[in-house]
Amino acid sequence: MNDWLFDLGNSRFKCASLREGVIGPVTVLPYLTETMDAFALQELPRGRVAYLASVAAPAITTHVLEVLKIHFEKVQVAATVAACAGVRIAYAHPERFGVDRFLALLGSYGEGNVLVVGVGTALTIDLLAANGCHLGGRISASPTLMRQALHARAEQLPLSGGNYLEFAEDTEDALVSGCNGAAVALIERSLYEAHQRLDQSVRLLLHGGGVASLLPWLGDVVHRPKLVLDGLAIWAAVAANV
């Protein structure tokens, strides 16, 4: 039986098989709320060991864990540590560094100096030097969350729709341009500062469910949609040898 990797985020739930260190095709599962659909949970794969990375609400994580413990012989939950597989986290209290960010750094180690950007509910930015030292990062709202926040405070502002323009001439376009533009500007500023700090070239890596709307405006960027799962596979290999 295969081992399986599970990436449970705030709005997306993905999994992939893991066999002899090789990750299989990624499956996007129905996102499970606190009122979970029991049938959907029963459709989760079965295997030997399940490796779970979760930044979801505790109630959601608990529900998923309960089912995984039935479907698998063993379940291991990834957690951030100060140092792992060549990567050293900058936080004085590593447990406060999100496990998704931690795993994304593990997945990108070995690719030189990298600026790792995750676009989901939040927009996260982390700088990893080629020697494995994490040099810190930023957290902001993603463009999607920005629009949700604006709509929540001013219902007349549409939640979706519009096209990116540098100077928009209607509200929907202006919202897309402002929210996406804010994200692009923060990424570009961070990339500039990364170059200044390291005085070397820095690759820009993007992952997460919200990257599609930003990719056209970021120039030389590497899209790594399964970066967290890549990191989880590395974490799993370390855990298996402990």
Swiss-Prot record:
Residues reported to bind ATP: 7-14, 121
Keywords carried by this UniProt record: ATP-binding, Coenzyme A biosynthesis, Cytoplasm, Kinase, Nucleotide-binding, Potassium, Transferase
InterPro entries on file: ATPase_NBD, Type_III_PanK
Free-text cofactor note: A monovalent cation. Ammonium or potassium.
Annotated CDD domains: ASKHA_NBD_PanK-III
Pathway: Cofactor biosynthesis; coenzyme A biosynthesis; CoA from (R)-pantothenate: step 1/5
Biological process terms in GO annotation: coenzyme A biosynthetic process
Active-site annotation: 100 (proton acceptor)
GO MF, any single term: pantothenate kinase activity
GO cellular component: cytoplasm
Enzymatic reactions: (R)-pantothenate + ATP = (R)-4'-phosphopantothenate + ADP + H(+)
UniProt enzyme class: transferase
Chief localization: cytoplasm
Cofactor: NH4(+); K(+)
Pfam families in the record: Pan_kinase
Subcellular localization(s) per the UniProt record: Cytoplasm
Binding-site residues, substrate: 91, 98-101, 171
Function: Catalyzes the phosphorylation of pantothenate (Pan), the first step in CoA biosynthesis.
Record-stated family: Belongs to the type III pantothenate kinase family.
Subunit comment: Homodimer.
Protein name as catalogued: Type III pantothenate kinase
Organism field: Xylella fastidiosa (strain Temecula1 / ATCC 700964)
Chain's gene name: coaX
